[in-house]
Amino acid sequence: ITNKTLLEKAGYTLDDIKSFDDLKKVADDIQSKKDDLGIKGAFTSAGMDGSSDWRFKTHLANLPIYYEYKEDGIDDTEAIKGTYLDQYKNVFDLYITDSTCDGSELSAKTADDSRNEFVNGDAVFYQNGSWEYAELAKTYSDDELAMIPIYFGVDDENEGLATGTENYWCVNKNASEEDVQATLDFMNWCVTSEAGTKSMSEDMGFTIPFKTAEAPSNVFVKQDAEYTEAGLTPVSWNFTTIPSEEWKNTLGSALTAYAAGSGSWDYV
């Protein structure tokens, strides 16, 4: 997520960022003149406490998995080869180097810390998703916000936004037949009726993939559609194939130690 106003204050526009190399060049420059710009860093803190670490042990970790799966033409595997771990390191290095704080502080930084840094204008870039729109819209107008791909240095010219879901509606099969049917009817109403789709779109910020649904007011969702219409390829969420939460926690611990300078990238 990008603060376009701060980006322009630094002398850049979105057109200047079309690849990882571009992003690094811009972020490094912003970091070098952060005091003159009146900010604390190019990126908000990559918080590694439990409220925030999922952004890096899951969502950022999705990128090397996605590109490996894409290259091999698969959608799951027993073990990744690690083909794109160097690119993963490059992005994480950028996050912790061009940051609002020192890497040693990230273990205690929270999701609220990162959001507040962005809301307060302390940083230009903030890795998060469309679900943050409602909070950010309290401070910024749509014209001030943009979402750009997490450029990974692999296929940047064709890369769109990372899109997907890991949440699903489920109905308890052990409930009464009457309750099961009532639940299914309600779920159908939510995604087909005018009131239901309006609530899900405007109040909840969801994308509803049906022609009759209310168009989303969420500017990030609109921008995702624009990227896709322009021919860019959405990055699918393949992190749902990660073995377990324990696996992700181990990765998170390794990332935290690396950021603090007390652990090697080899552990990652």
Language-model region placement:
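Short helix-initiation/N-cap motifs at beta->coil->alpha
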Residues: 18-24, 105-120
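Short, solvent-exposed loop/beta-turn-alpha elements that line the ligand-binding surface or hinge
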Residues: 47-50, 65-90, 138-139, 152-161, ...
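Extracytoplasmic/periplasmic solute-binding protein
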Residues: 24-77, 123
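Extracytoplasmic/periplasmic substrate-recognition and gating elements
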Residues: 138-203, 253
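A structural signal for short loop-to-beta-strand junctions that line the ligand-binding cleft
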Residues: 1-7, 41, 156-162, 233-241
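Glycine-centered hinge/linker elements that transmit conformational signals in sensory
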Residues: 26-28, 72-108
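C-terminal capping/gating helix-and-loop segments adjacent to ligand/active sites or protein-protein/ligand interfaces
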Residues: 163, 206-209, 224-268
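Paired acidic/hydrophobic, glycine-rich loop segments that form the ligand-binding mouth/hinge
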Residues: 124-129, 146
